[in-house]
């Protein structure tokens, strides 16, 4: 990142940010940039060892105070447990990054029912429930700390079109995009910065979890490149309701929204066979 704390319009210094899915990939990227900008962190994900290692790294590099809360957001009651944990520790969250999520590649008819359920539970239900629970506090933080409170929900370029063999994942991300854009409008008078981040193929563990190689000639974006897009949106005087990382991805998203739906799904269906 090239911007300084003083120049950044999004300045979370002295506040607390919660990052879900913080044990790898974009979650780690968000944690580092938020810590660099002076926020303390609440880190949650399933893998305690990774969270603890990240907390140590953030403390050594930035002097960050991190609270580690290991949770599986696919489990019933995970979000209420997380909120209760925050309340018991008297932690007031000013920035929420709903980064946790995953997809599985394959036809729906062949997918294990528990994994279909878990995709919806993490990508949709947990994101919605956590946002709903913390939104009043985020809005209060935005009033108390102008330019220092934000809601970032992880969508995807998959949100802009149906994707055969990633049907549940793409549909979930379409929900996240629509949900976030509506909240952007609902909260516009509070000063809360709200955006849906839509990355394309990125150098994370997504493809390993999805049991699928990226395929095709496209270059994977780095986590740092995606973070530059995310924080440029937060630094903007008027944070956009969504932001797509990468020029090629922006063109693809625009084309998907402009072409007939039947043609789009035929193209994505053919591409998903690669």
Predicted regions and their residues:
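Conserved glycine-rich cofactor-binding loop
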Residues: 16, 23-25
């Amino acid at each position: 990142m090239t911007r300084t704390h003083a120049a950044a319009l999004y300045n979370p210094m002295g506040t607390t940010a919660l990052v879900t899915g913080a044990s790898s990939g974009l979650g780690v990227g968000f944690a580092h940039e938020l810590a660099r900008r002076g926020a303390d962190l609440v880190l949650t994900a399933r893998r305690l060892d990774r969270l603890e290692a990240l907390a140590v790294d953030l403390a050594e590099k930035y002097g960050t105070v991190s609270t580690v809360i290991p949770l599986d957001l696919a489990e019933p009651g995970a979000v209420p447990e997380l909120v209760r944990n925050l309340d018991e520790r008297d932690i007031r969250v000013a920035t929420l990054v709903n980064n946790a999520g995953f997809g599985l590649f394959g036809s729906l008819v062949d997918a294990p029912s528990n994994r279909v359920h878990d995709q919806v539970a993490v990508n949709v239900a947990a994101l919605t429930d956590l946002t709903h629970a913390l939104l009043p506090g985020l809005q209060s933080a935005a009033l108390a700390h102008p330019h220092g409170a934000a809601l970032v929900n992880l969508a995807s370029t998959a949100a802009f079109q149906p994707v055969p063999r990633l049907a549940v994942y793409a549909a979930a991300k379409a929900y996240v995009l629509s949900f976030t854009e509506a909240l952007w409008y609902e909260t516009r008078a509070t000063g809360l910065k709200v955006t849906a981040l839509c990355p394309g193929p990125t150098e994370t563990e997504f493809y390993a979890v999805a049991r699928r190689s990226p395929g095709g000639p496209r270059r994977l974006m780095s986590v740092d490149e995606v973070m530059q897009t995310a924080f440029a949106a937060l630094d903007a005087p008027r944070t956009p309701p969504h932001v797509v990382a990468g020029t090629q991805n922006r063109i693809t998203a625009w084309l998907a929204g402009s072409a007939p739906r039947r043609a789009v799904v035929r193209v994505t269906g053919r591409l998903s066979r690669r």
